[in-house]
Amino acid sequence: MKYKSYSLWGIFIFLYSSIIIPQWVSDPATNLAICTVEQTQRETRLCKDDAGNIFIFWRDYRNEPTIFGGDLYAQKLDMCGVPLWQSNGNSIISGFGGQFDLKVINDGEQGAYLVWRTSPNSFQDYSLNAQRINNNGNKLWGSSNVTIQSGLGTTLNQSITMNEDGDLLTIWQLGLTGTPNSMDIYTQKINSNGVVQWNSNGLAICLTSAISILGPKIISDQNGGAYVCWSDNRNGLSNFDIYAQRISSNGTPLWSVNGIPICTKTGTQGTKHIFSDNNGGAILFWEDIQETTYSIYGQKID
C-alpha cells in the first residue's frame, strides 16, 4: 500500500538559555522526548499558559495510520520541562477521518482554544471545528466539539485570535462544492462557553468570483467586533490586492460589501499582518511585489 512510504517519526523538544546551556536535559546531545509511539507524529503546535507551562499539540497516526487519518494529541510541560500529562500524550480530538491543520491560542485561564479541520466525508470536504480545553486537557465544550462550518465545501487557511471578552474569533477561506474556481471568506465568533455568536455555519465576509484568496487575518476591534483583511485577485489572475472589513459585535459587516480596498496597485500585495492599535483601530502591513522588487507597506484603519 502507498501508506507504507510513511516514515515513523517522534516528537522531541529542546530549550536553550541565552548562553546555550541545555535547560531540560543534562546531556546536550539529547533532547526531551515528548512522544515516541509507533506511527507518525507531525504538525506540531505550541501554546503557553499564563503560569509558564507549555501545551504541545500534534497530529498522531497511532490509531489510524493512513494518509487520511490522524487524531490530535497533546502534552503539557512545566517550566522545568517535566511532562504533566500521561506518557506519549493525551488524546484531545479523535474520530472518523483526519483531524489536522490545528490552530491554537491561550484562553487566558491556563487553558487553550483549538480550531482545526477534519475530513469526515471525503478528501475534498473539510469541515472546521473548535474546542476549548482546561489546564488538565479536559474538553469544556462537550465531547462532540463545536462545528464552525460544515457541508459547504473545503475550509482552509483559518486564522484565530481572542478578544478582550475572552471570545474566540476565527476567519477562514471556503471553496464551495461545485465551484472549484472560486473562493469565499467567512468568519465566526464563539463565546467562552462555546456558543456561536454570529450566523450559523459562518458569517460571509467576501463572496466574489476571485479564484484565489491569500491568508485572511482577524483581530479584535476592542468593542466586541473585529477587523479582517485578506488579498484576492478579483481584478486579475496575477493582480492580488488588499481588502478589509469591519464587523460589529452582533455580526454585521459595517463597510462595503466584499470589503473596502486598502491597496490595489498593479502586481501582488500579499503576506499581510494585522494588529490592534489598542485604541479601537487596526494597523496592517503587507508585501508589495512589483516584478522582481519587494517592498513593505502599511496602513491604519478604524
Task: Please name every model-derived segment.
Residues 22-302:
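Extracellular, repeat-based ectodomains that mediate carbohydrate processing or recognition
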Residues 1-9:
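Bacterial N-terminal signal peptides that target proteins for export
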Residues 9-12, 111:
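N-terminal leader/targeting segments
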Residues 9, 20-21:
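Cleavable N-terminal signal peptides
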